[in-house]
Amino acid sequence: MAKRARLRLILLAKLVSLKMSDEKEKRSLRPVAFVAVVFSTVAITSCLITFPLILHYIQTLESQVQLDLEFCQARARDMWKEMLDIETGGKKDSAKLANIVLNHRRLEKRDTLQDFWARRLHDQELRDQPVGYDNPSVGVESFNSEGGGCCTCHRGPPGPAGDGGRDGADGVDGTPGEIGPPGPPAPPGPDPHSLFPPQCPCEAPPGDGGPPGQPGPDGPPGAPGNAGEDGKPGDQGPRGPPGIPGAPGQPGRPGPPGEPGTYKTEVGPAGRAGAPGRPGPPGQPGPAGPPGENGKGGGQGPSGLPGPPGQPGQNGAPGEVGQPGDNGAPGSCDHCPPARLAPGY
């Protein structure tokens, strides 16, 4: 029994301590959960706001770049038109245009990236605007084969060798060569003592002492010292908390029988008056009394509940035509895309 009681007390104490610790943990985790919810809400809101802004910026940048490219292409075409007009004198001569194209083709191997794109734009311009053929025989030769038929390859014979190309860029520096053999010994130079006159021997007084040097590094650690004497015993600690109350002890042995009591017949003094007793039960009902007088008439009672709704009445006559409303607000062009204009406008 005693062991069971102790176990019950220990279990109760542990349960109480666990409940207290759980409540403390819950209270400590409440602010952490609140902060986490706030930060997650802010992060999601910022993402919902920034993603559409980024997409709008990318679309605007793409449209601007496309406009710049179209403007550059248009300006390049205009420049090529002006150059062709200057070289041909404003006349659409097929022979001159063919010579210009051949001259540009000869520089194909030496063209840079800029020349390549310029040639492409020039060819496209020639395709877009075909020239007239006033004299179709100019610059055109017919080549016949040995059998007398037309040439089927549609190519002319190879032309003469072109001019020499431009000089190439300088090559990379070569690796350094090996070390050569040592050269012959150099002739002896003049004696340095002969350049200066002899000096008289003299002794100067010693100078002042220099400043103290910086402290040297720390020395190695010394050997361990001897063990110290044992300390004095400490003072007596405070009294500990009271322990868990023990289980109730076993009942004691029954005591010996007591001595027989004495019976006294003397009458003692009269005691104090007792408290009043409880009230008795109710009596039987009495006879019926005479009838009372008639009461006065009552006042008007409250109003009753409203009745059901009646049938709908007939439609009224049509009203007069109302006055015309005010003019609406003028429309805006916020929903329209930006106009495609060249840069600088």
From Swiss-Prot:
Pfam families linked: Col_cuticle_N, Collagen
Bias-annotated ranges (Pro residues): 179-191, 198-223, 278-290
Superkingdom of source: Eukaryota
Region (Disordered): 161-345
InterPro entries named in the record: Col_cuticle_N (IPR002486), Collagen (IPR008160)
UniProt keyword Nucleotide-binding, yes or no: no
Gene Ontology terms, MF aspect: structural constituent of cuticle
Assembly and binders: Collagen polypeptide chains are complexed within the cuticle by disulfide bonds and other types of covalent cross-links.
Protein name: Cuticle collagen 14
Species, as recorded: Caenorhabditis elegans
Gene that encodes the chain: col-14
